[in-house]
């Protein structure tokens, strides 16, 4: 998969690809709000629109990964539980 060019990914294949690309960070099916200037003009598109109905590459998949959380924040959350 990693060496493949743009292809369509749907359902479980799409989820597997996102898990592969994003790892422990997790991912979103819709881009976070305020993403890019085009989001104001066009209706919000999700990963299914971009990668299942059309083809997408690894760089496009990475746009849906959740941001990395700082290690300190992760530790303090665990300490509170």
Curated annotation (Swiss-Prot):
Ranges for region B: 5-33
Residues covered by region (D): 67-74
Pfam families xrefs: Insulin
Record has Disulfide bond as a keyword: yes
One Gene Ontology MF term: growth factor activity
InterPro entries associated with the record: IGF-I, Insulin-like, Insulin-like_growth_factor, Insulin-like_sf, Insulin_CS, Insulin_family
Main location: secreted
Stretches for region C: 34-45
Disulfide cysteine pairs (residue numbers): 10-52, 22-65, 51-56
Keywords: Disulfide bond, Growth factor, Secreted
Record localization: Secreted
Prosegment location in residue numbers: 1-4, 75-81
GO cellular component: alphav-beta3 integrin-IGF-1-IGF1R complex; exocytic vesicle; extracellular space
Stretch list, region A: 46-66
Domain of life: Eukaryota
Record-level GO BP terms: cell population proliferation; insulin-like growth factor receptor signaling pathway; negative regulation of apoptotic process; negative regulation of release of cytochrome c from mitochondria; negative regulation of smooth muscle cell apoptotic process; positive regulation of cell population proliferation; positive regulation of D-glucose import; positive regulation of glycogen biosynthetic process
Keyword Isomerase: no
Described function: The insulin-like growth factors, isolated from plasma, are structurally and functionally related to insulin but have a much higher growth-promoting activity. May be a physiological regulator of [1-14C]-2-deoxy-D-glucose (2DG) transport and glycogen synthesis in osteoblasts. Stimulates glucose transport in bone-derived osteoblastic (PyMS) cells and is effective at much lower concentrations than insulin, not only regarding glycogen and DNA synthesis but also with regard to enhancing glucose uptake. May play a role in synapse maturation.
Assembly mode: Forms a ternary complex with IGFR1 and ITGAV:ITGB3. Forms a ternary complex with IGFR1 and ITGA6:ITGB4.
Family affiliation: Belongs to the insulin family.
PANTHER family (UniProt xref): INSULIN-LIKE GROWTH FACTOR I
Protein name: Insulin-like growth factor 1
Gene name as annotated: IGF1
